[in-house]
Amino acid sequence: MGASGLVWTLTIVLIAGLMLVDYVLHVRKTHVPTLRQAVIQSATFVGIAILFGIAVVVFGGSELAVEYFACYLTDEALSVDNLFVFLVIISSFGVPRLAQQKVLLFGIAFALVTRTGFIFVGAALIENFNSAFYLFGLVLLVMAGNLARPTGLESRDAETLKRSVIIRLADRFLRTSQDYNGDRLFTVSNNKRMMTPLLLVMIAVGGTDILFAFDSIPALFGLTQNVYLVFAATAFSLLGLRQLYFLIDSLLDRLVYLSYGLAVILGFIGVKLMLEALHDNKIPFINGGKPVPTVEVSTTQSLTVIIIVLLITTAASFWSARGRAQNAMARARRYATAYLDLHYETESAERDKIFTALLAAERQINTLPTKYRMQPGQDDDLMTLLCRAHAARDAHM
């Protein structure tokens, strides 16, 4: 399916149109989407991605459709992993809930532009350098190793992100205010026009998007060398990311084994790329520059492995004791924060509802085994937050 210029143009117009409609209908007017809205919008974008896959079957055949769906599933799984980092960034900078949609839409648009650039660079490398698959495979194996290490997960903490080079440079050279002004990027403070912290958040999100492209793009080229399919799969997986954030932000902490599943997927694709590179080897110091007989892994087999790994990872996360512990702590943290954020004029019924939910989460934590309750680096902060919420409750009574 060597897509023609017309097909490329129509696809780009479709994607741009979907982003514009999403902005006009759901982002331009500042609001927090309800669960029902998030479900409907997420289902809509997934449905569009599936319809595109059906179109690939009709016009390109089943083999190309399998390649597309394998790329789409892989990039969607990696995008869910991106949401962990987005959540950390948004939480660490204290972005108001009403402004989060604009941050996410910017991140998606920026990611689409940068990843498109990476896609064409990757395609050029594959076309002109015989050893490109060795490079891509090595990158994926390194990324898989980083995801599999517990320390790789710890690098996502808020302070690490805030200390990143991009944020430190922006904070130093850009005049920013200390407070947010709704979802505006600029405000006036002391008769001076300044940028709000929302711009720093967007810079942080954009910077992390660039880093994530280093594992997602090689992974997709490990499944297909069709540039058009790689672009389409990337675009459709990113388009639904904003809705997915609001749909599963309460479940992200529960997916405790997702990174390990992604490590397996990236490692598998990395090995697949290495095998393909050996099969077409032309490097003089490897087997005298001659191809090496290897096992061929089909795209259908790759798609099967991806689906099985994601199913096992998700099931293990939701049914494990560690997953239940993470969920209980996340709920307690969320309700404690929600209670502390209540306005002093909030109705008593609403206060009681949130505090009752907080007490239920605390009771669930108390029923957990000690080894799951005592998590280094999280326990002290959570206990402090809970104490503040109880103190606020006592002060209001």
Swiss-Prot record:
One of its GO terms (cellular component) is plasma membrane. Its main location: membrane. Keywords: Cell membrane, Membrane, Transmembrane, Transmembrane helix. InterPro entries: Integral_membrane_TerC (IPR005496), Integral_membrane_TerC_rswitch (IPR022369). It is a multi-pass membrane protein. It holds the Pfam family TerC. The chain crosses the membrane at residues 1-21, 39-59, 76-96, 103-123, 124-144, 194-214, 219-239, 255-275, 301-321. It is found in: Cell membrane. Belongs to the TerC family. PANTHER family: MEMBRANE BOUND PREDICTED REDOX MODULATOR, THYLAKOID MEMBRANE PROTEIN TERC, CHLOROPLASTIC. This is Uncharacterized membrane protein MT2795. It comes from Mycobacterium tuberculosis (strain CDC 1551 / Oshkosh).
